[in-house]
A protein has these predicted regions:
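Mature, function-bearing regions of proteins
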Residues: 1-164
Length: 164
């Protein structure tokens, strides 16, 4: 990591009341006061597996999907990341990902996380806990709620590649 940068910052969910789940943890590597690289730790909910995507923030190229995240998305996809890293407190951190079908080149998925950087201290942590006391459960319930809606719409279901 030293040749890439001299500081690492983690963007992740907090553990609430002993419960922890985070579909995406992001490690930003900073060199000379600028974020230069990002390590995205992706978790898939039903299988409790993790995969890592290492990204050069100055050379974000499309790359093949390497990890089965959702049973509603096939593996034959390509990812494109658009990142505005948290270089300072003034500009927002934006993590945007799009996935495209390798067969048709159509966009099949799009997600954006837009956050403002804030200091980590006791008062900020207390405010966060009081404002969102059940964040872990909310995230997990949201994922399963969306999955149920997709099932009811009869969206195709793709088995885990290692389970075939």
């Amino acid at each position: 990591v030293e040749e890439l940068g001299n500081e690492v910052f983690l963007l992740a969910h907090l553990r609430y009341f002993g419960l922890y789940f985070s579909p995406l943890n992001v490690y930003f590597v900073k060199k000379n006061e600028r974020c230069t690289h990002m390590l995205a730790e992706v978790s898939n909910t039903p299988w409790r597996e993790k995969h890592y995507y290492a990204l050069d923030l100055y050379d974000l190229k499309q790359h093949p999907k390497e990890f089965h995240v959702s049973p509603f998305n096939p593996m034959e996809q390509t990812y494109q990341w658009i990142i505005n890293p948290p270089n300072n407190y003034e500009s927002p951190c934006v993590i945007h990902i799009e996935s495209f079908s390798q067969k048709t080149s159509d966009k099949v998925f799009d997600a954006t996380l837009r956050l403002r950087r804030k200091p980590l201290n006791n008062s900020a942590l207390t405010r966060t806990l009081l404002r969102t006391p059940m964040q872990t459960l909310t995230v997990m319930m949201g994922i399963y709620w969306q999955a149920l809606k997709l099932l009811l719409k009869r969206v195709p279901f793709y088995k885990h590649p290692s389970k075939l």
